[in-house]
Amino acid sequence: MLSITQLWLDGGRLTQAPRSQITDTQNPMFGWTAVSDTDGDGQTACRVTVADADGSLLWDSGWQQQAAQRLTYAGAPLPVGQPLSVQVGLRSAGGEETFSARQIFYNGQRPQWEGCWLVPTQYRSRAVNQYRRRFAVKGPVRNACLYVAGLGYHKVWLNGRALDDAVLDPAHANYAKTVYYTVLPGLETQLQADGTENELVVQVADGWRHNDSAFVEQATGGRKIEFAGQPMLSAVLE
């Protein structure tokens, strides 16, 4: 009998780690790893279902007669920032069917960026700029997801707790043309929703946005770097 040992999302392992659960496309590719306890047995068909936070089906691939261990999503538009779930079913050469547990993933592809850019009123090279927002929430929060881009690098805390162990976010790019952002989903469990004040803190440091080291100056011959400038922050919490 076949056993599904691992699900994959866009070529990466889908695990409990939040970063592994993010897709940046409306057509993610799901993959899986399977083993069999019978010699010569293998996958002859597969089926993938995707559901929203309510359990409503967004896509059912139906049974596909194939040995390939991947399928590309081809269903309804995926909601952004909300928990979605995927399940994979396999059919063996002997006709036995097995299904994986449902696993959570998120679509982090925002169709439009609504956040404004914040810059420090006074700038000092190699200083860490700290932005703080306090807010109260009354009533249950169903879903909460933070999208944040701090140039050059940012670090985020919610109610005194670091939301991620990463230290080099966001990914580097030519900021004059492209800015990447970090997706931090599932924050509804960390918000105080009884009217008590929440505190969101983002620290932003120079990174590659403003690098005045002698090495960089020597490497560029003193010419101005296109993407250089003051550290900036833009974020959306919804």
Model regions and ranges:
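Short, compositionally biased P/S/T/A/G/V-rich stretches that sit at domain boundaries
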Residues: 1-27
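Short, isolated positions in well-ordered beta-strands
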Residues: 14, 97-98, 163-164
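Surface-exposed loops/turns
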Residues: 24, 80-81, 194
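Accessory beta-strand-rich segments of carbohydrate-active enzymes
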Residues: 32, 71, 85, 92-93, ...
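Short amphipathic, basic-aromatic surface patches that mediate peripheral association
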Residues: 33-38
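Recognizes extended acidic, P/S/T-rich segments that occur
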Residues: 41-83, 93-97
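Terminal edge beta-strands and adjacent linker/stalk segments
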Residues: 101-104
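Boundary/junction segments of secreted and surface-exposed precursor proteins
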Residues: 111-122
